Each structure stands twice: as structure tokens, then as C-alpha cells.
């Protein structure tokens, strides 16, 4: 079940550095709730998504699980206050927060024992492989 937060709860979470957010949340609803427009384009210079801190661009034509994961990642950048390209540390923080937003740790832990590969787990969770990895890492597991 997806958790729903109202705008006041999101603002409170943002002020707290988004540390108290825990998924799963609907990234499309989150974008709408915090007033972040999402556009689809084929021109992202090889990237799956991008943000300037106010707007998100997603590569058109992605598989639904990759699109959801990319949107969660770009929203994480916004929640963390990122407004431009990030170094590896900034990307790491966005990856970890995106996994917390999109994945429920109890579900990740439970399904991990049932799946034989990271790819299979990603399919079950409805996320891409990268975000699933960070979800495992957040649960103190390694793939």
C-alpha cells in the first residue's frame, strides 16, 4: 500500500532533510503534491532524467519500472535541495533517498528471500535494478 502525505507533511519532511520519509510513496503523486512539473523528452544527452530543482525531465519511452525509479531519483535530488549536476556523493545520497521513497524495507527484506537474482527482485518490486540495489543496501543487505 502506498503511503500518502499531504503538502504540510512533505514540507515538514523537507525541512528535516527528508530523513523521516519512508516508502513506498507514489512518485507521480509526490511530484504533483510538491508542485514539481514532470516533462518527457527524447533529448537528455544520454541521461534517463534530469532536474534543475524546480522541474523534472524524464526520457520518453522508458519501461514503467525504470520511469518510476528515475522519477523517484530526480525527486530525491529536489528533496535534498540539489539544483544542478551532482558529484558522486550527491548521486549516492539521491540514490539512497529514492530507494527509501519507492521501496518498503519490509517488502524488500521479505521478497529478497524469495527471489533468486537482483533482476527478479527488481521485477517483483516494480523498480529498476539500480534502485533495488539501494533498497537492499538500505535494509543492510548486499545483493
Language model regions located:
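Active-site hotspot residues in diverse enzymes, especially metal/ion-binding acidic/histidine motifs
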Residues: 1-143
